[in-house]
């Protein structure tokens, strides 16, 4: 058994397709698409494979989805603090030729061990069809207990099972300290109109903070320049389309300037790219929110494209996300963001900073 890499993605997809093709009851198994399996190969997520020579005989995936919608804890009405202490045993797949050798249980144990090495004491959730007696028996033998029965994955009946090391542990909602700074930035959710329009929505939130009463799609429709390749000074694709990519700080700054100039507004937009996160806090102290680039649900960004402009190479990252930094708590080391996907959320400063740095410390301020 070994941890799989991106080089193993094709064999993972081939084995999954083989399982799907040979299932006598298709309701028992729901395939994972290629982009998701690719994400599962990126740390902190992991896929472990059992090999017979070069042949993939079985694999299991463990993922840390934080507070993303796919976290099964939402189905159990868990709060955000508990979600961040929860991993998902997403899939265990065993080639029919290798069944009967205990591979499902071995992979389950490996995934549990890995999850708790990264996040000691974490809860691990998984789903199994009520009619898949073999899988139910195996996961329950590894300490999983049924939490709920419901419909998932587009109409498939499932149990949610949990391996919960401390059922009595409480996860109180975060309460900021008396030293916390919090600005009243009204949140706007980008969906369903702008599935990839987080940047224009973040800009809209800040402009509305200054008294401009913009509708959700106005910036995206009237002021955002678009291009099929350029994500640095233009929006690559269409923010109304799920396949759109995004626009980086230089382009978003120019978008803001176009709007402010047309309105004869007193504010000016400035690109602060390169500024350490801690050096943005003085703006918050002055009641000035800052647009920053991080990732969706604090997921690991994955370099997927590049674009050269003015001799400089820029990299675009899958999971890139643009939000409004509108508060911080120096005692609890949290930052408050107005997130077009999650709403107003306190994020852990350390992880937020790691991703902010990885994306090039992109930030835009209007003042």
Features from the language model and the residues they span:
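Conserved active-site alpha-helix within GNAT-family acetyltransferase domains
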Residues: 120, 130-149
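Active-site-adjacent structural segments surrounding the nucleophilic cysteine of cysteine proteases
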Residues: 170-258, 262, 296, 303-307, ...
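Conserved acyl-donor/pantetheine-binding loop and adjacent beta-alpha core of acyl/acetyltransferases
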Residues: 59-91
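Conserved acetyl-CoA-binding loop-helix of GNAT-fold acetyltransferases
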Residues: 94, 100-113, 137, 141
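Active-site rim helix/loop that mediates acceptor-substrate recognition in acyltransferases
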Residues: 25-53, 61
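Noncatalytic regulatory segments and standalone regulatory/sensor domains
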Residues: 298-300, 304-319, 323-367
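Conserved GNAT acetyl-CoA-binding A-motif
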Residues: 115-128
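A short beta-loop-alpha structural element at the N-terminal edge
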Residues: 1-14, 25
């Amino acid at each position: 058994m070994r941890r799989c890499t991106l080089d193993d993605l094709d064999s993972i997809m081939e084995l999954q397709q083989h399982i799907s093709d040979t299932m006598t009851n298709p309701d028992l198994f729901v395939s994972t698409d290629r982009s998701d399996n690719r994400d599962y190969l990126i740390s902190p997520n992991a896929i472990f494979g059992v090999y017979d020579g070069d042949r993939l005989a079985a694999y299991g995936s463990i993922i840390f989805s934080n507070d993303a919608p796919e976290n099964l804890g939402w189905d159990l009405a868990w709060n955000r603090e508990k979600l961040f202490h929860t991993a998902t045993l997403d899939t265990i797949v065993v080639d029919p030729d290798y069944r009967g050798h205990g591979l499902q249980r071995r992979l389950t144990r490996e995934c549990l061990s890995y999850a708790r090495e990264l996040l000691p004491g974490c809860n691990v959730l998984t789903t199994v069809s009520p009619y898949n007696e073999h899988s139910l028996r195996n996961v329950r033998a590894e300490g999983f207990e049924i939490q709920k029965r419901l419909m998932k994955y587009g109409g498939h009946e499932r149990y949610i099972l949990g391996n919960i090391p401390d059922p009595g542990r409480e996860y109180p909602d975060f309460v900021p300290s008396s030293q916390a700074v919090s600005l009243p930035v009204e949140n706007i959710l980008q969906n369903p109109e702008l599935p990839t329009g987080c940047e224009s929505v973040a800009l809209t939130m800040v402009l509305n903070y200054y008294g401009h009463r913009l509708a959700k799609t106005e910036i995206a429709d009237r002021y955002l320049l678009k291009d099929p390749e350029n994500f640095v000074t233009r929006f690559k694709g269409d923010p109304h389309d799920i396949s759109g990519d995004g626009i980086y700080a230089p382009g978003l700054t120019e978008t803001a300037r176009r709007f402010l100039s047309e309105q004869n507004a007193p504010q000016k937009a400035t690109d602060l790219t390169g500024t350490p996160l801690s050096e943005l806090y003085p703006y918050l102290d002055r009641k000035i929110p800052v647009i920053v680039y991080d990732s969706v649900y604090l997921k690991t960004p994955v370099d997927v494209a590049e674009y050269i402009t003015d001799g400089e190479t820029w990299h675009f990252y899958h999971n890139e996300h643009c939000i409004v930094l509108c508060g911080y708590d120096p005692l609890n080391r949290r930052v408050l963001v107005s997130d077009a996907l999650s709403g107003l959320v306190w994020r852990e400063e350390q992880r937020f900073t790691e991703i902010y740095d990885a994306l090039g410390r992109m930030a835009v301020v209007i003042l």
